UniProtKB/Swiss-Prot annotation:
Residues 1-24 form the signal peptide. This is Thiol:disulfide interchange protein DsbD. It is a multi-pass membrane protein. It catalyses: [protein]-dithiol + NAD(+) = [protein]-disulfide + NADH + H(+); [protein]-dithiol + NADP(+) = [protein]-disulfide + NADPH + H(+). It is found in: Cell inner membrane. It comes from Sodalis glossinidius (strain morsitans). GO terms for biological process: cell redox homeostasis; cytochrome complex assembly. The chain crosses the membrane at residues 193-213, 229-249, 266-286, 310-330, 349-369, 388-408, 409-429, 438-458. Gene3D superfamilies: Glutaredoxin, Thiol:disulfide interchange protein DsbD, N-terminal domain. The keyword Electron transport applies.
Amino acid sequence: MAQRRFTLILLACLTCLPLLPAHAALFGNSHGNQFIPAEQAFRFDFRQQGSQLTLSWDIHPGYYLYRQQIRLEPVNATLGAFTLPAGSRHHDEFYGDDVAIYRDELNITLPLAQAQNDSQLRVTWQGCAEAGFCYPPETQVIPLSAIAAAPPSGTGIGSTALIPAPPPAGGQGIITPAPPPQSNNLPFSPLWALLIGIGIAFTPCVLPMYPLISAVILGNRLQLSTARVLLLAVVYVMGMAITYTLLGVAVAAAGLQFQAVLQQPALLIGLAALFILLALSMFGVFTLQLPSALQTHLALWSNRQRQGTLPGVFIMGALAGLFCSPCTTAPLSAILLYIAQSGNLWFSGFTLWLYAVGMGIPLILVALFGHRLLPKRGPWMQQVKQGFGFVILALPVFLLERVLGDSWGTRLWSLLGVAFFGWGFLLCLQARWRGARWLAVLMLGLTLISARPLQDWLWGAPADMTSTTGAAPVFQPVQTLAQITQALNAAPGKPVMLDLYADWCVACKEFDKYTFRDPAVVEQMSRFTLLQADVTANAPVQRMLLGQLQVIGLPTILFFDSRGHEIPGSRLTGYMNAADFTRHLRKLAP
């Protein structure tokens, strides 16, 4: 009897299985049921014990918090020095390959330097699901208990005191000792600093000085072993590297105080203009160097050191790091300004250390083998200097791309490519060595290829290219529920698609880049009236809209019929590829 009952129950369960998808469709597709509300994905708690405040997040499995999106804003209170946990590295196509995230749990201990009875701390965080679903930034205001102001204390290398400031437009402001949003995806590896340092060694201001510097650090001691010569040269280079390393750490530490400001368009444009001026100095438009009086004072101080001794050579190298010749000032200033945006002390110090080592490698070779290894001076040295001018010009293009957008960024990169390869083409025409003509042909071809985006912008893209790649869909922007209702009423008998978008939503950008531009998707979307609500700023009116539409995160796409009613089971949450999205649209508008 028991076996018969078990068999009947099993048959009943198997019979109901095909009905489960149909019942699930009544409440939305399976794509939308797999995500939990933000308060469940990231359970936040806090505890204050005297002058110590602990913030903790319990992160649900399969979800993560962005380190760069954690923002702390004290109100009528002062926070002491602290650091955020390093987190784990995460590959992100749009934020960069080296984004720091937190999984499972996060605990932050904050020292309170001063607080009153009415003091508060605004804590903001933002995270996503591994499956491709992002939540809007969450903010919680924490009441603080009053404590007496503590005497000021210095900050260490690994920490910084916070200065409360309002977040910039777009919700990307960061007030924390963590790197800014683009700190980890700067298109600049520290190894590039090594190559730049080696290249700077072959500029007309630096290369002729190496034999003289080699003689100075070795002194009058002619009978030195190879090991001793190598040791003296390395000690000199390490002394120079120490100066540059400390300079990089100091610049990064200063940049920590202004990370939110470093994301402002006005400052990005100003930095881009400064980089352009530095590049012009490399092209010989003007000369940039330390005042001659300061250089003379440093030279006299260096000459007082004992030549041929390890301490004296080390001090000479450290002082040499302060000399800025016309050829080194511009690249060094560009690197310093660039790494100031990272706020990462170790990254900045290591970058400048590699830069100094790169400059010192030719010096070590000269000390060991003499000046015979050095190439002869000539016009090629000036060409090396000009080449670094183009390297510096890449930095303002990167900065302006954030302000002007991807389209103008592509045009600026195209313009830089045309200028660089065109310059290389002219140099190859003037060269007389074998193979220069073939290299000139290659440079000409690269110039024409680089000019393609500019050509498409000025004269329009070819029709066959447009039809192959698919044009970007045109959405009608909406911000409030009233505007959405008005657009639904005005829809000309067509179903309506409402896309909820934000810049901090990675999957939203994947939709825009991969799905919406697919030709089959574009064809199906033409049957819909397209609306889009940009909630990047996470303003109160935008949070109200998300609440009214019962949206817990992005990307979320809603579909309405021609009468303005949301189509049951049509709502999408999370990323969907072009093929699946096309099939979904065909079901809604066959």
